[in-house]
Amino acid sequence: MKKLWGGRFTKTAEEWVDEFGASIPFDQELVEEDIEGSLAHVTMLGECGILPEGDVEQIKGGLIRLLEKAKQGELKFSIAYEDIHLNIEKMLIDDIGPVGGKLHTGRSRNDQVATDMHLYLRKRVEEILGLIRGMQRALVAQAEKHVETIMPGYTHLQRAQPISFAHHLLAYFWMLERDYERFSESQKRINRSPLGAGALAGTTFPIDRHRTAELLGFADIYENSLDAVSDRDFIIEFLSNSSMLMMHLSRLAEELILWSSQEFQFIELDDAFATGSSIMPQKKNPDMAELIRGKTGRVYGHLMALLTVMKGLPLAYNKDMQEDKEGMFDTVKTVIGSLKIFTGMIETMNVRTDVMERATKQDFSNATELADYLAAKGVPFREAHEIVGKLVLHCIEQGVFLADLPLDVYKEASPLFEEDIYDALHPRTAVNRRNSAGGTGFAEVRAALAKAKQLLSTP
């Protein structure tokens, strides 16, 4: 089959070679963006007097019909035309005749595909921003219910100090806020038009690049035609931002997996986000959380793959850059799906407040309270630390907890201990005393919730 670019060639490639080089199996994802870009391009060609009005109207009519079919999923693509651009051009020519071939005037597939991807990512990043906000709202809604729910806080996965469960949830709120800021800020670089840069050097036609940028809603154009067609920074930045977002989701997924286990029993995930076993009738597996944890690795892989593709490419376009799309599409799908799943899991999980609070009374996570108690009475903290460490060792040897020790044992360790030590040892008191800025004290958590809600209400 004759290629649309085949004039210089004396023989055609074998079918298997065409299949290896074709991108249509995956870049058909860009069909709507490709047609939208073409509509802006042909409109500009008409306004600049490069194409007659009659040709422009014919081409626009054909493109609009193709766009309607694309939205209905009615277009059939062929590997013979290798990519989304040539497939659409062939369909247009079949519909309106040879005049359809004028669409490509003053344009290359190099600036065309770059434009498509800018349009595609701009839409998807907006969707991701909305989903991040949705998950943040779910976290805030759960946190509001659990300001005074006490749980063990951990370091090294060992119980460290008691904290408010709301405080723990809000830690993820602020991680997601940084993700939101990164994605939002990246739109400045995504929202820039490469259209009109041509293959690499611009075009001899008197086009108006600012006009096509305006028609497509771009804030600006690329200032250098070589940069315009060879830049994939905006995709790499998207993959990097997605990797950090998925890392945050994976960390929370790991905690939900642990908390829902028989060993913790802090939460129960809704049945809609769990599965059973084909052999063990009792099992309720946190599969959705595990999948998100697993899918994080593929997003990291896509980032490293594209960095590796781009690291040695001379200017301007190289066929290697065709490898930018599948990882981008898969990352978009993974991030959007993960955020939707996570929002549902957070909204519907059952929190076992009694188990959480009981866990804070069956360990030594209140030991810091004793050290702080002595330090507040003038004992150097390192000396206080040593005294309390010996008390903890005594408890371990006796099989009891700090709250079980009689006052005379405390007095023997330090005469500064008084009856009020037992109030300080209570987990709820320990949590509520930590009212330094950003701390887990109930007043601070409520202030943090108010700040989070105000942020969510800001357009």
From Swiss-Prot:
Record PANTHER family: ARGININOSUCCINATE LYASE
Catalytic reactions of this protein: 2-(N(omega)-L-arginino)succinate = fumarate + L-arginine
Cellular localisation: Cytoplasm
Any one Gene Ontology cellular component term annotated for this protein: cytosol
First-level EC class: lyase
Record Gene3D superfamilies: Fumarase/aspartase (C-terminal domain), Fumarase/aspartase (Central domain), Fumarase/aspartase (N-terminal domain)
UniProt keyword annotation of Transmembrane helix present: no
Name of the molecule in the record: Argininosuccinate lyase
Molecular functions (GO terms): argininosuccinate lyase activity
Assigned protein family: Belongs to the lyase 1 family. Argininosuccinate lyase subfamily.
Pathway: Amino-acid biosynthesis; L-arginine biosynthesis; L-arginine from L-ornithine and carbamoyl phosphate: step 3/3
Species of provenance: Geobacillus kaustophilus (strain HTA426)
Domain of life, source organism: Bacteria
Organism lineage string: Bacteria, Bacillati, Bacillota, Bacilli, Bacillales
Enzyme Commission number(s): 4.3.2.1
Transmembrane segments: none
UniProt record, GO biological process: arginine biosynthetic process via ornithine; L-arginine biosynthetic process
Xref: InterPro entries: Arg_succ_lyase_C (IPR029419), Argininosuccinate_lyase (IPR009049), Fumarase/histidase_N (IPR024083), Fumarate_lyase_CS (IPR020557), Fumarate_lyase_fam (IPR000362), Fumarate_lyase_N (IPR022761), L-Aspartase-like (IPR008948)
